[in-house]
Amino acid sequence: TNVIKNIFKINRKINDTVKAIKDFKPDILFTVDSPDFTLRVAERLKKKDPNIKTVHYVAPQVWVWREGRVKKIKNFIDHILLLFNFEKPYFDKENMSNEFVGHPLLDESSEGKIDINQIFEKNKALISIFPGSRTSEIDVLMPILLDFIKLMNKNYQDFIYIFHSTKQYYDLIQSYIKSKNISNCETISDDKIKSHTLKKSVFAVAKSGTVSLEICKSKVPSIILYKMNFLNYLIVRSLVKVKFANIINISAGK
């Protein structure tokens, strides 16, 4: 989402959320991810009620930029749960209570096997495509991804492109595909089918994010992409301190 564009709307939602939580009077506030929203809620709530205990799951990416945020965060978050072990030193350094709990994608047990050939009865190699999990991301990336497929089709006729979606965005993705009249594309939204389709894929193209972990776990070569508007790009470029944009490359340091 374009945070800069929607800053006033977001601020209003934060205040509404803080009020609703305060009226509910919980003993513990448990926030998950989305630090631009959840941590602001926790901070404002803590000011109004210093006795409430706060726990946050999925640490903000202080290893990418603004490492100094930890000093501020520990003033209103009592305990933070970490996805990656390499994050721990950043919070230990500031004596902030934290715990490495792991990432669900890396810990999940294997599911029952599904024969992908029963789903796609076509003797062609699969390329998995992950266009994002928000409307704004899909709207930005689908035209780029479909142009990529059209270019590939000019030289290679042996691939089927599988768009991985949720039921919520299935129709949106399908509408983009139909608008370009590309026949060798499929869209799937069933999680078990998606998992095994990825494992059968020879390649993947994905929007930067958690999905890159799943792709890596499946040992599928990939291209990771992201596109932001020019104003956001200028701001982020001056603040980001890591060399890589993909969590896998950041973890590996190469």
PLM region spans:
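Nucleotide-activated sugar donor-binding and catalytic core shared by glycosyltransferases
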Residues: 1-254
